[in-house]
């Protein structure tokens, strides 16, 4: 059963993921990595998303088993790496693979289990 905090975190995850999808729509890897402003905003949203994913309680994670919890747990420290190849790879992988899959499954869960996203006492 999700708590109020977990529901809020799921909403935050969805919002940050949607922001990343909008910001990166149509961008190639090189374009994203060259664009200081877009890159900075995308990285900020990814850090919010990854950090929020790590804070969701184990019981709530169990209710959304298709989300790649371990993948986000592993990606989180890489998104906080100093500028360089590790960060570039993490940034692009998150944008191309992790975010789309996460948003897809969140949409499915929101349709089939809306109570997971309901922030009510």
What label would you give each PLM region?
Residues 1-121:
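Solvent-exposed interaction patches of small proteins and small membrane subunits
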């Amino acid at each position: 059963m999700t708590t109020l905090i977990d529901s809020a975190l799921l909403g935050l995850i969805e919002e940050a993921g949607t922001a990343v999808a909008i910001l990166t729509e149509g961008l190639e890897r090189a374009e994203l990595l060259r664009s200081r402003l877009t890159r900075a905003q995308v990285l900020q949203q990814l850090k919010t998303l990854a950090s929020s994913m790590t804070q969701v309680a184990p019981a709530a994670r169990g209710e959304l088993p298709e989300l790649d919890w371990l993948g986000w747990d592993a990606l989180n420290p890489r998104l906080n790496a100093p500028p360089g190849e590790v960060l570039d790879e993490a940034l692009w992988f998150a944008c191309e693979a992790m975010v789309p899959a996460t948003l897809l499954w969140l949409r499915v869960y929101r349709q089939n289990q809306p109570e997971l996203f309901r922030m009510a006492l």
